[in-house]
Regions:
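Nucleotide/pyrophosphate-binding catalytic subdomain
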Residues: 1-161
Length: 161
């Protein structure tokens, strides 16, 4: 896909990985990094594009508040970090988008939400309505209740949908 095709797209899905949101140590959100990413999204919206952000980072954002310095290996601690970090992540996005008078929303999905037709259709309707209202949906895998998703990186699959 050419740069011209990307800049003229009416709808853009941006996948943001944890390493793009955290400081050098990778264990805390970096507000300036989030602000820079949001500035790019805001520029896309300003030219008329609908933008969906698929963002990782909940586990990374939850590490420092829990006193953890590295990503935990066990599922329960990963889920605890995701639970703490998701609120921090969305709060940072909300604050960053507010600088541009843009409303952001949180959409947490699980595998069930994309494989069960009725769940998928409901999520799809919600996303379409958010875009219609001018909101930037911030989609993340619901890592606090997910199991295999944490290990297999389902945000990549979410972005592809």
């Amino acid at each position: 896909m050419s740069r011209e095709q990307i800049t003229s797209a009416k709808r853009i899905v941006i996948k943001i990985g944890s390493s793009s949101l955290t400081g050098k140590a990778g264990s805390a959100l970096d507000a300036s990094a989030v602000n820079k990413l949001v500035d790019v999204v805001a520029a896309c919206k300003k030219r008329g594009a609908e933008v969906v952000v698929v963002s990782s980072g909940a586990i990374a954002a939850g590490l420092a508040p829990l006193g953890l310095t590295t990503r935990p290996k066990d599922l329960a601690t990963q889920q605890a970090a995701a639970s703490v970090g998701q609120g921090l992540l969305v709060a940072q996005y909300t604050q960053s988008f507010a600088r541009h008078s843009i409303t952001a929303s949180q959409v947490l999905l699980t595998t069930e939400d994309v494989v069960r037709r009725s769940h998928y259709q409901n999520a799809q309707r919600t996303l379409y309505k958010l875009l219609q209202l001018g909101v930037v949906p911030i989609i993340n895998e619901n890592d606090s209740v997910g199991t295999q998703e944490i290990r297999f990186g389902d945000n990549d699959r979410l972005a592809a949908l």
